[in-house]
């Protein structure tokens, strides 16, 4: 017996949509949505394809996701070509199966079933889809959100289909995400010969006490929703490659994943104060990729928990761990934002796969969420 969710997922996987190339995925989704009465607005920016689609009016529940995928890596290491979907032992293999073409298929099929049963639904059902989530994310969801906010679009609830689950579908639901702040720091010294250190100023030596103190800071202890803020050095570079040259500069890049106990300005102020304390000459550049956000218990969280409990008979954990997602942009609209998607064990890996039965289950969960909020 054929399954519309699996069939649509396979059609999407066959389109090699390496970010930000959509490769025809959105045209396929748009065709399905227009067939059930959705109005579709394409909102392309530069090399990125996006669309905003809606049906009905009133309180708005949007489903958000991305059609782009990361590169497959060495295709010869896959058990089948990465863009040729294959089912083995109940698992659907292919790049994007879990992140997140399976979720997109489940959303669309859920909408088709929902509209068939509730053609005159009382709320507004919407979709916000982009082809640039995995790469820079500069021209994707963030630009669509800015355009929607500029015209005062209303968005009450948003379900993001990112692969949130760990062992079984629905065991983890993300009701928030930590903020992400990156510091690109250059410590300036004076280049010279290692045999004449008095004629140079070694930025590595100067920066070492600063780095040690930075690493030792306990930024906060987190709270009931967020783990403690973490700081990790990601890159550090100095020197010419020669063993007889004192470097003139040290570059160090570090990233903060921060909770709602802090703001990005508080972090910046503490880092800058530490630099001044150690009397360093420096140039600094900050990149804030997202503020922390949290959706506390409310109508959306309750609807998602209800759907998981109904179909999988488990109570999901509400967590804010992991990386950033496009939910950070959507939360700016004042919407309640929750992430629910398939198991994430193989995302971005060789032989990415998802349990085919999980996608069928996910479509039912999505439909039940629609029924609770906009029927």
Curated annotation (Swiss-Prot):
Residues binding Zn(2+) 1: 66, 99, 162
Cofactor binding note: Binds 2 Zn(2+) or Co(2+) ions per subunit.
Keywords, in A-Z order: Amino-acid biosynthesis, Cobalt, Diaminopimelate biosynthesis, Hydrolase, Lysine biosynthesis, Metal-binding, Zinc
Enzyme Commission number(s) from the entry: 3.5.1.18
Cofactor(s) the record lists: Zn(2+); Co(2+)
PROSITE patterns: ARGE_DAPE_CPG2_1, ARGE_DAPE_CPG2_2
Active site residues per record: 68, 133
Pfam families hit by this protein: M20_dimer (PF07687), Peptidase_M20 (PF01546)
Catalytic class of the enzyme: hydrolase
Keyword Metal-binding in record: yes
Binding site for Zn(2+) 2: 99, 134, 348
Keyword Metal-binding tagged: yes
Metabolic or biological pathway: Amino-acid biosynthesis; L-lysine biosynthesis via DAP pathway; LL-2,6-diaminopimelate from (S)-tetrahydrodipicolinate (succinylase route): step 3/3
Catalytic activity: N-succinyl-(2S,6S)-2,6-diaminopimelate + H2O = (2S,6S)-2,6-diaminopimelate + succinate
GO molecular function: acetylornithine deacetylase activity; cobalt ion binding; succinyl-diaminopimelate desuccinylase activity; zinc ion binding
Gene3D superfamilies found in the cross-reference section: Zn peptidases
Residues of the signal peptide: none
Highest taxon above the source species: Bacteria
Single GO biological process annotation from the record: diaminopimelate biosynthetic process
Matching NCBIfam families: dapE_proteo, PRK13009.1
Its biological purpose: Catalyzes the hydrolysis of N-succinyl-L,L-diaminopimelic acid (SDAP), forming succinate and LL-2,6-diaminopimelate (DAP), an intermediate involved in the bacterial biosynthesis of lysine and meso-diaminopimelic acid, an essential component of bacterial cell walls.
Complex and partners: Homodimer.
Family listed: Belongs to the peptidase M20A family. DapE subfamily.
Name this polypeptide is given: Succinyl-diaminopimelate desuccinylase
Gene symbol of the encoding locus: dapE
């Amino acid at each position: 017996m054929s399954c519309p969710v699996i069939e649509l997922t396979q059609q999407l996987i066959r389109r090699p949509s390496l970010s930000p190339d959509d490769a025809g995925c959105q045209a396929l989704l748009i065709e399905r949505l227009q067939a059930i009465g959705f109005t579709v607005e394409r909102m392309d920016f530069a090399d990125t394809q996006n669309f905003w689609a809606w049906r009905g009016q009133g309180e708005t529940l949007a489903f958000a996701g991305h059609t782009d995928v990361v590169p497959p890596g060495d295709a010869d290491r896959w058990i089948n070509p990465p863009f040729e979907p294959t089912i083995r032992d109940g698992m659907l293999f292919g790049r994007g199966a879990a992140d997140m073409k399976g979720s997109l298929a489940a959303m669309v099929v859920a909408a088709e079933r929902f509209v068939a049963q509730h053609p005159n639904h009382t709320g507004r059902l919407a979709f916000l889809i982009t082809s640039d989530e995995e790469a820079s994310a500069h021209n994707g969801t963030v630009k669509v959100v800015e355009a929607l906010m500029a015209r005062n679009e209303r968005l009450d609830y948003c379900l993001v289909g990112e692969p949130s689950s760990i062992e079984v579908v629905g065991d983890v639901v993300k009701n928030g995400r930590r903020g992400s702040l990156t510091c690109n720091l250059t410590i300036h010294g004076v280049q010279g010969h290692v045999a004449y250190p008095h004629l140079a100023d070694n930025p590595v030596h100067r920066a070492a006490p600063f780095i040690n103190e930075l690493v030792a800071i306990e930024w906060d202890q987190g709270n009931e929703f967020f783990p403690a803020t973490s700081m990790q050095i990601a890159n550090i570079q100095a020197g010419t490659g020669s063993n007889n040259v004192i470097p003139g500069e040290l570059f160090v890049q570090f990233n903060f994943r921060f909770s709602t106990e802090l703001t990005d300005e508080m972090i910046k102020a503490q880092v800058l104060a530490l630099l001044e304390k150690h009397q360093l000459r420096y140039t600094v550049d900050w990149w804030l990729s997202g503020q922390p956000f949290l959706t506390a218990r409310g109508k959306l969280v309750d609807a998602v928990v209800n759907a998981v409990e109904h179909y999988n008979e488990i109570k999901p954990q509400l967590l804010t761990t992991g990386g950033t997602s496009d939910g950070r942009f959507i939360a700016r609209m004042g919407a309640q934002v929750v992430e629910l998607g398939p198991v994430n064990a193989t995302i971005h890996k060789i032989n990415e796969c998802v349990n085919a039965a999980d996608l069928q289950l996910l479509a039912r969960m999505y439909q039940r969420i629609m029924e609770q909020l906009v029927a």
